Regions:
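Compositionally biased terminal segments of proteins
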Residues: 1-227
Length: 227
């Protein structure tokens, strides 16, 4: 873990603030991307505005978890219009808590369940440990989000940027994907094949990654993941 990860301070602040809910929620999203980077020479990931987490809970239980958040100093971010967003009063950090079950809030990501099932304890230092998405689940959830809310816009999608950063900064990802369930592996493969076939992708790739000199490496890894 790199101490200069731009998202680490906010992630630690939220992890501290949720208290024992750390044993229940799984941290996902762009704020965790830097923790998945294993190449010490990799460029820093993008700084995110919020910290995301998911939880396996039915409607009643999810509301009880929301009540616990309120008791821990979180308030709903009404102005944002984001139904799952909270603000931590003390730190002013944004926290998006999303249920795995799409019936609870009316939306989800089909790989959230897999992300919860495969989550691993991850140390943030100073005795602080969270449950965090694995690299394969991160890629699957981000590609799903790219196709959904990003509408496949390769130039404007932070989700795609996060995928490319992890592909670039985690050499072992290809081997990790080989051991994932077939349904996840096939979905990732299909999404990446579509991405690689995009008419503008090859020309846009150098501008989508932190270090344009790594374009050939990233492209080679994407092709292996798509094969």
């Amino acid at each position: 873990m790199r101490r200069d990860d731009p998202n680490l301070p906010n992630l630690c602040a939220i992890a501290e603030a949720v208290g024992d809910l750390r044993d229940r929620v799984v941290f996902v999203g762009g704020a965790t991307a830097g923790l998945l980077i294993t190449d010490p020479a990799a460029e820093l990931v993008r700084a995110t505005q919020d910290v995301d987490a998911i939880v396996e809970a039915q409607l009643g239980e999810f509301h009880r978890i929301e009540e616990q958040l309120a008791a821990r100093g979180f308030v709903r971010d009404i102005e944002s219009g984001v139904i799952c967003r909270w603000i931590h009063r003390e730190s002013r950090n944004l926290f998006d808590l999303m249920p795995v079950d799409s019936h609870v809030l009316g939306f989800s990501n089909r790989w959230y369940g897999y992300a919860v099932d495969t989550a691993r304890p991850t140390s943030l230092g100073d005795g602080l440990t969270i449950l965090m998405v694995t690299a394969p689940a991160f890629i699957a959830t981000k590609l799903e989000a790219f196709a959904d809310r990003g509408a496949g816009d390769i130039l404007a999608s932070h989700d795609l940027e996060d995928v490319l950063n992890v592909v670039d900064g985690r050499e072992e990802l290809t081997k990790e994907m080989e051991t994932t369930p077939a349904r996840v592996r096939d979905a990732v493969r299909t999404a990446l094949k579509q991405l690689l076939a995009h008419a503008d992708f090859n020309n846009a790739l150098p501008g989508l990654i932190a270090d344009a000199d790594r374009t050939d490496t990233v492209l080679r890894r994407l092709r292996r993941l798509a094969s």
